[in-house]
Amino acid sequence: MSIIKPAIIIGNGPSRNIIDLEKLVGKAPLYGCNALYRDFNRWDYLVAIDSGMINELHKDRVDNGDLIIPPEEERWESIKYNSNGRRRTNAGMVAADYAIRHKNNLIYLLGFDFILDGEDSVDNVYKDSKNYGPETHALEEDNYNRMKYFEWFVHEHIGVSFIFVVPDHKIEHCKSVRAGNVRAMTTSEFLKKLEK
């Protein structure tokens, strides 16, 4: 039996707003995405893949914790997934990849709202702020490709468990992921687990 090594990836979907991120500190390594530093500075790793955000981080001299700015090659879907017409990935997927590289085998996904139905699935807590203009807004139809890539990614990491943390009232509105190593958990259940 292997030792469970959890990590928490903090995405930028609005569902993460119901969690006091301070309560996560010290429970597991925290991997944040892009502009998280604007609201919360106790992350262990912060991942940025877009030029505007990378410039903002450098300009603001963000250096608490480890800043992960992957090489350009890692800012796109894996060539193993799609060698032709690779799509840009997102900081959350890159953060999950780095968490696995750091030997974590239980990945909690907060604010990964593409798992939800409807408009909530494409909203962002930083929408319409600096570096989050209309050109960055996701569309619901983008979720099909996001989900397909996520399913491929988790199949590539079959020894890792992935848990989407979603608001209690949205648990019935999660999309189905075709992978045995993925499930959803309510925010209440997640917070109780942290208290143990």
Residue positions per predicted region:
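Metal-ion/cofactor- or nucleotide/acyl-coenzyme-handling active-site neighborhoods
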Residues: 1-196
